[in-house]
Amino acid sequence: MSGSQSSGSPGSPGPPGPPGRSALVVYGSETGNAQDVAEEVGALAERLHFTTQISELNHVKPESLRSYTIVVFAVSTTGQGDLPANARTFWRSLLLKKLPPTFLSGVRFTWFGLGDSSYPKFNWAARKLYKRLLQLGADEIYPGGEADHQHSSGLEGTFIPWLAGFRKHLLDKYPLPPGQDPIPDDVQLPPKWVLRLRDQEAASEDVSPPDAMGAAVTGDFPDSYRLDNDHRPLHDSLTATLVQNKRVTPQTHWQDVRHLILTVSDPISYAPGDVLTITPKNTAEDVQSLIEMMGWQEQADQLVSLVPRDSTRSTNELPSPPIHSLDSYPRLTLRELLINYLDIRAIPRRSFFAAIAHYTTYEMHKERLLEFTNPEYLDEFWDYTTRPRRSILEILHEFDTVKIPWQHATSTFPIIRARQFSIASGGELKRTSVGGARFELLIAIVKYRTVIKKIREGVCTKYISNLRPGSTLKIQLQRGGLNSSVGQLVGPTMLIGPGTGVAPLRSMLWEKAAIVKSYQEKNPGVDPPIEPTILVYGGRNRAADFFFEDEWQQLSDLIKLKVLTAFSRDQKQKVYVQDVIRENSSLVFNLLHDKGGAVFVCGSSGRMPQAVRETLTEAFQYGNDAGTQPFSRREAEDYLVGMEKTGRYKQETW
């Protein structure tokens, strides 16, 4: 994300464009991709001289939409076809029964959805928003577009051609007045917010620069520079203490998987399927490297403030800052900003290359950087960035003539985004001995090789892997999309979760165990009214990555748990979870059809959930051994669709 285009509440005008030429770009985003799209659309509109506002949907009142010439919606799908959290208030306001079919008459809009076709409800959020806008009288002025996470070129594969078509539409339908041309791509749009040194008195305060090349985790840094002590004022966050960070795969195993236990003092409630988000930090070494490359040594340890570029605008006209809560950071230096908030190890988007091309005078570098922004070179862009996972820091090392003004850091670098992890604890595992909340996570540390010699590491999991017990870190609790009811927890269920996908399923199993134990305490000697649960687990090797094996044995009798396993590398013929489902098709048919059970699929997106869905369809066709008429292919597919509609088939993949 670039902070340069982010704007505040609709209704606050930006720089004036031609009369009757305004654009509102709104987004619903869970991980930031829809916000990236919104900001790129906003930049396009600004170059076409639209007075442009960008905002998350929850900050918008539906009745304000008609005051803009055009409105663009960028919406991701999360959970079971849901809108992201920062769009749900807006969505609920559109669902009020009292709204007449003319409520949004005069609103001219288009939309772009972001989804993952491995989910049954692909781009569901954007599609249902589109339909509701039409129901309320809004006019679609340009056909919406859809991005698919599974596309070979990622979201860019469909977004770039959609954006090019939208630009042509705007120029055709909203032509510029004579003598006015679009702002060329090689002309920099001014950032909305900039950094500045605090007044001379504050800047002269003793802020001693650390030896940034020392040890990052336990080195002699001020607290705010250390990875293991997190006191950032992040919105809606909790400060958690790390109790355990244990590797649960052998050192010889190809993958480092960690079992984390975190605690907070407050007795916070959560349910199976909920997620924790963790906001990582950059290492002091990486930040020092950037400071030296950019020549920011003089400013690095001085106190800075983030201020609007145009200080003449009134408070209610100010755009929203790219980073929130900085005003509550008591002594913010440029170095602290880089360590705590700016993602210098992200894989950049095309807009980053466009931004840094303005900061070099070396024509060969400028030309090369601009080539990466050209849609005609999309494959080359992917070959340079996404496929080898080349980071911003590495790119700046290679294009060493780029010198970004420190004042523009927040409008050039993306913001560090929180990463989501499914909570693996439930039932009695949710509380500490002193009444606080306890969270368990199962996290695969991202570490791999590409064509680049240096090993690739995930920004967040590298941060997590370096934390030791006793560390504090910022977390946020978010409601998940599985929404398993008590009836489903104690009823017939089939849980499918290879690898770390078992984490949210473990939460469900321990929750079921707590329900059973509570019933037994209240009804001694009476069998609890529960149905069987089948867990289908997959890994590479039973001896290396059969997570929580001892627990499954412990819970088997208590909650009527049956575990089916598929270890792909323990025999010559590879076996996956879908193969185990196929081998047990009669059992599956009985549980899901005859008993009316529910299915929960968790784990990696892509082939696994699609293969599971196909195998379940086959089970409905061939698993009925009761002698009655078997399902046809169409009937089996329809039955599975019916399960989705009634909440009996849910998927949470990543």
Curated annotation (Swiss-Prot):
FMN binds at residues 29-34, 76-79, 114-123. The gene is tah18. FAD binds at residues 389, 419-422, 458-461, 654. It is found in: Cytoplasm; Mitochondrion. HAMAP family: NDOR1 (MF_03178). Interacts with dre2; as part of the cytosolic iron-sulfur (Fe-S) protein assembly (CIA) machinery. Residues 23-167 form the Flavodoxin-like domain. One of its GO terms (biological process) is nitric oxide biosynthetic process. Its EC number is 1.18.1.-. The keyword Flavoprotein applies. Residues 1-10 have a biased composition (Low complexity). Its cofactor is FAD; FMN. Keywords: Cytoplasm, FAD, Flavoprotein, FMN, Mitochondrion, NADP, Oxidoreductase. GO terms for molecular function: flavin adenine dinucleotide binding; FMN binding; NADP binding; NADPH-hemoprotein reductase activity; oxidoreductase activity. NADPH-dependent reductase which is a central component of the cytosolic iron-sulfur (Fe-S) protein assembly (CIA) machinery. Transfers electrons from NADPH via its FAD and FMN prosthetic groups to the [2Fe-2S] cluster of dre2, another key component of the CIA machinery. In turn, this reduced cluster provides electrons for assembly of cytosolic iron-sulfur cluster proteins. Positively controls H(2)O(2)-induced cell death. Residues 1-22 are annotated as: Disordered. Pfam families: FAD_binding_1, Flavodoxin_1, NAD_binding_1. This is NADPH-dependent diflavin oxidoreductase 1. Belongs to the NADPH-dependent diflavin oxidoreductase NDOR1 family. In the N-terminal section; belongs to the flavodoxin family. InterPro entries: CysJ-like_FAD-binding, FAD-bd_FR_type, Flavdoxin-like, Flavodoxin/NO_synth, Flavoprot_Pyr_Nucl_cyt_Rdtase, Flavoprotein-like_sf, FNR_nucleotide-bd, NADPH_Cyt_P450_Rdtase_alpha.
